[in-house]
Structures are given as structure tokens and as C-alpha cells.
Regions:
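A mobile, often basic/glycine-rich helix-loop segment
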Residues: 1-33
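Acidic carboxylate-rich catalytic motifs and surrounding loops in phosphoryl-/glycosyl-chemistry enzymes
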Residues: 1, 42-49
Length: 264
């Protein structure tokens, strides 16, 4: 996390000490403590709560009624003996929209030409070697993994994090098999909005609204946990963890009296 004080590089000299990382969070937690709040925080990935998407978000929950507070217990896993507890995939939410996808952004003819060469689940690295420098332009020699360039989703994996536009060159979100970006409706499905949810404005504005949202499954998990603390029905459960490598960690945390997870 960020240092409390930021000194621009242009204003630093060799004698300036490095600012301690994490001091912003330390101050926030200290202020909550002064106000009498118990807090718990962590980074939650929506894919672990039934959302067909990898989407990490920092979550902080607090209470000042002398209640123990918890983060929501994960409900889904990459591998689990029970399929209903396995990660949800792109296929599970958009396959039926292949020929009824609705409103959709468009790619330029230049980008579309290169996308047609990329297989399902692939990206720019799957282009012919002699084509890559042309397709990537100046980004070809830049740093970073550049995984979003000419990216097609995989039907049988969770989606990457939905961003505010599927057609930005560095963060493309393209259909697994069709030569187009994900549609507005497909975007909404991955974020778990119901089909009758109304988004307003231009096509770009609709993508932005969806991309900025908290996925329904993650929001629901947080809401239920807060409610269970408020009405004093929070209990720690481990049954659903059986068959996963998380089970022992949760069991040990309970034995130590300090589990961060709860469900209603």
C-alpha cells in the first residue's frame, strides 16, 4: 500500500529517506481504533465467491458495537470434489449468447485482422512471429507481460478482470471464438447482473458502468457477512473446504481463536 507522504521524484534528492510503505493503511486503522471500531481487512478475489471472473478487491469491514467482525468465507475453489463449489467459467454465463449478444463495441479493421489469428484463450504471443512486431507496434519493445493485447477469453476458465472498455489495445476483452469484443450483455453476465438490468447512456458508458461495478456475488458475500455480524448469527464453517488445501488453514485458525472468515 501507499506511503503516507508522497514526494515526487523531481523533488527528491539522494538524502531523502524512502517513505515507509503501508503507512496510509496504518493511519486509517489507527483512526478507526480511536473511534472504537474493531476492523478486519484483506484482498478478496471475486472468483472465490462464485463470480466467473478473477477480480481482486481490498475489503475493510469494521464495527464499533464490540462485535467480532469477519471477512466472508470463500465458497468456490479451482479444484473441489463437489462441482457446485468449483470456479465458475466464462462458458457457464455467456455461451447461450453466441448469436444473441446484443449491443457491442467494434474493433478497427487493423486490430480485427490480427485478432482473427488468435486462438481461444490466446493473445498477441500466439500470432505468427513475423506478424507480432507489426501488430504490437511500439508496445512490442516495452516492458511488462502485455497479456491484454489481442486477448481472447477462454470458455473453460474464469474471465480476467472486466475493465471499463473491452477494446483498449492493452486490455482487450474479446470473445472466445467470435471475432469481436465482448458485448455489453456478456460484460454484464460476467459481473452477474440480471438480464433485465438497465444500463443507460452510450455503448461506451454502459461498458464503463459495468466495468466499475463490484460483482454481484462478491457484494452479496460481503453483505451477508455484515448482516450476520449485526444480528449475531455469524458462525465459522469449514465443511465446504474439505477437499481443498484451505481446509487445514481455516481449521488451525479456528483452533487459535482467530479466524477471519464467517458465514450466516
Amino acid at each position: 500500500s501507499s506511503p503516507l507522504k508522497h514526494v515526487p521524484l523531481s523533488e527528491r534528492d539522494e538524502n531523502d529517506p524512502e517513505q515507509k510503505l503501508g503507512t496510509v493503511l496504518d493511519v486509517i486503522l489507527s483512526e478507526f481504533d480511536k473511534l472504537g471500531y474493531k476492523t478486519v481487512y484483506g484482498v478478496l478475489d471475486a472468483v472465490n465467491y462464485g463470480v466467473p471472473q478473477f477480480r481482486e478487491r481490498f475489503v475493510l469491514i469494521g464495527s464499533r458495537d464490540d462485535e467480532d467482525v469477519f471477512l466472508p468465507i470463500p465458497t468456490h475453489f479451482q479444484m473441489h470434489q463437489d462441482k457446485k463449489y468449483q470456479w465458475q467459467t466464462v462458458r457457464s454465463v455467456i455461451e447461450d449468447l453466441e448469436f444473441d449478444h446484443g449491443e457491442c463495441a467494434t474493433l478497427s479493421e487493423e486490430r480485427l485482422k490480427f485478432l482473427k489469428m488468435v486462438p481461444e484463450g490466446g493473445n498477441w504471443r500466439d500470432l505468427p512471429k513475423d506478424i507480432i512486431p507489426i501488430a504490437m507496434g511500439g508496445a512490442y519493445k516495452s516492458g511488462g507481460g502485455k497479456v491484454g493485447f489481442y486477448r481472447r477469453l477462454s470458455y473453460d476458465q474464469p474471465s480476467p478482470t472486466v475493465v471499463t472498455s473491452p477494446v483498449q489495445k492493452a486490455t482487450m476483452m474479446c470473445h472466445p471464438t467470435q471475432n469481436r469484443p465482448l458485448s455489453v450483455k456478456e460484460y454484464a453476465r460476467i459481473q452477474q447482473f440480471p438480464d433485465d438490468w438497465v444500463f443507460t447512456g452510450t455503448t461506451a458508458a454502459k461498458y464503463r458502468q459495468i466495468g466499475n461495478a463490484v460483482p454481484v456475488g462478491l457484494a452479496e458475500a460481503i453483505g451477508k457477512t455484515v448482516l450476520s455480524v449485526a444480528d449475531n448469527t455469524a458462525i465459522v464453517q469449514t465443511k465446504r473446504f474439505r477437499g481443498t488445501n484451505v481446509h487445514n488453514k481455516i481449521r488451525n485458525a479456528i483452533e487459535l481463536g482467530g479466524s477471519l472468515y464467517a458465514v450466516k
